[in-house]
């Protein structure tokens, strides 16, 4: 994968990564470290965080690496402070992120939706662990998938990516920052403990092979520019930075093109509709599925993160037995690729959906199937992973549907 720019079709001139920040070469590193390197390559120069297992290694590495490229890390007093501090730095012109896990992710919900409402481009890494509450701090789960999309109050839309390897942690970190800038939304990178802590080969290319989506700088002079007034065909406004002479008003209240609060239904309808449509219009672009053997499939295995690696073995075993089974590995979960799943549901017998939770993304799969095919959930409370033979049994069940 030499570039992640293929899906960025907005007509804006792409930039390249800063060579000072890119550790070009072949490395042996874990997913947390690779995510940090992806953030640096994407241009992140500010990180804020609070230590929490199993995500601590992301900010620990960033704290050491950022000063080498003119960046800064601040360990905050808690996740609340971290998740709002990074947004201040974004409005000051920086690319910024935080990282956390379950309990910290819960604390960040208010500020995630604040970023969605104010259209603040930023990235949240969530290295999921067993829950609820304190749960299993050192063991894997995928129980925060619905929380990533619906965890806060009100109506909003955002993007969530799901890597399944350290190599993909690097590339999806880069992509997360690009998508955050392209759509002016918070982007979640939903890792899990296994992916975050597994150590594998990670190939980092040269800086000129890493394309970066630039900040949408104002096209008008100070005095003429409106904070949310210069909106392109993609429904995403230009963004001014504090300290550049522009008048910027940022509020979590329903607001107009100036950013000023407006307390009426018309303003609410205009704003919320645009926040949704800037994502929904890009459904094809944001459909990120790694598919294999889907041309002749009777059964499609839907998985993501560490579970997809276990599922791959089950698919191999099934095809060796002559079963027509394909892979639909989600690299992007939100927005959910509804169009593609509705298409597939028309021609297969069953979806099989293993997850390290009690059934979350499978609900979207079942909704999109619309009764055209069977949906077989494979819930798992976490702490370990599925057995390939159990997934194989579910595939065989689906093939008999």
Residue ranges and their predicted role:
Residues 1-150, 157, 174, 193, ...:
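Thiamine diphosphate
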Residues 2-31, 181-401:
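Flexible, low-complexity linker and terminal segments
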Residues 43, 156-157, 324, 347:
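Short loop/turn motifs at secondary-structure junctions
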Residues 97-99, 123-125, 160-162, 188-190, ...:
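Structural motif
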Residues 74, 158-161, 326, 376:
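Structural signal for short hydrophobic segments within the conserved structured cores
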Residues 146-190:
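Internal, well-ordered domain-core segments that constitute the primary functional module
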Residues 54-57, 83, 105-107, 131-134, ...:
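Flexible loop/turn segments at secondary-structure boundaries
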């Amino acid at each position: 994968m030499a570039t992640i720019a293929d899906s960025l079709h907005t007509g804006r001139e792409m930039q390249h990564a800063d060579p000072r920040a890119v550790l070009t070469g072949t490395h042996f590193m874990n997913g947390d470290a690779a995510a940090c390197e992806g953030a640096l390559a994407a241009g992140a120069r500010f990180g804020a965080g609070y230590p929490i297992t199993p995500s601590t290694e992301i900010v620990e590495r960033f704290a050491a690496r950022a000063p080498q490229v003119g960046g800064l890390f601040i360990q905050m007093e808690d996740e609340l402070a971290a998740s709002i501090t990074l947004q201040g730095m974004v409005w000051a012109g920086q690319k910024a992120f935080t990282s956390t896990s379950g309990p910290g992710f819960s604390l960040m919900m208010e500020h995630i939706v604040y970023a969605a409402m104010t259209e603040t481009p930023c990235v949240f890494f969530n290295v999921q662990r067993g829950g609820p509450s304190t749960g299993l701090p050192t063991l894997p789960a995928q129980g925060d998938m619905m929380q990533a999309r619906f965890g806060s109050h009100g109506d909003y839309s955002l993007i969530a990516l799901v890597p399944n390897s350290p190599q993909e942690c690097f590339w999806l970190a880069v992509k997360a920052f690009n998508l955050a800038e392209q759509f002016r939304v918070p982007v979640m990178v939903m890792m899990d403990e296994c992916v975050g802590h597994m150590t594998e080969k990670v190939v980092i290319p040269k800086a000129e092979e890493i394309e970066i989506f630039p900040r949408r700088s104002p096209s008008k002079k100070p005095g003429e520019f409106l904070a949310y007034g210069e909106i392109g065909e993609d429904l995403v406004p230009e963004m001014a930075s504090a300290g550049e002479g522009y008048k910027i008003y940022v509020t979590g209240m329903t607001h107009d093109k100036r950013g000023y609060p407006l307390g009426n239904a018309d303003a609410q309808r205009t704003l919320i509709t645009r926040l949704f449509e800037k994502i929904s219009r890009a459904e094809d672009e944001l459909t990120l599925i790694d598919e294999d053997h889907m041309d002749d499939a009777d059964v499609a295995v839907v998985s993501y993160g560490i579970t997809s690696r276990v599922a791959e073995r089950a698919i191999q075993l099934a095809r060796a037995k002559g079963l027509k089974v394909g892979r639909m590995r989600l690299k992007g979960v939100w927005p959910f690729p509804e169009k593609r799943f509705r298409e597939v549901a028309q021609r297969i017998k069953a979806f099989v959906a293993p997850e390290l939770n009690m059934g979350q993304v499978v609900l979207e799969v079942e909704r999109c199937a619309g009764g055209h095919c069977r949906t077989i959930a494979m819930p798992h409370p976490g702490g370990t992973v599925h057995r390939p033979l159990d997934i194989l049994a579910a595939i065989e069940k689906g093939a008999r549907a």
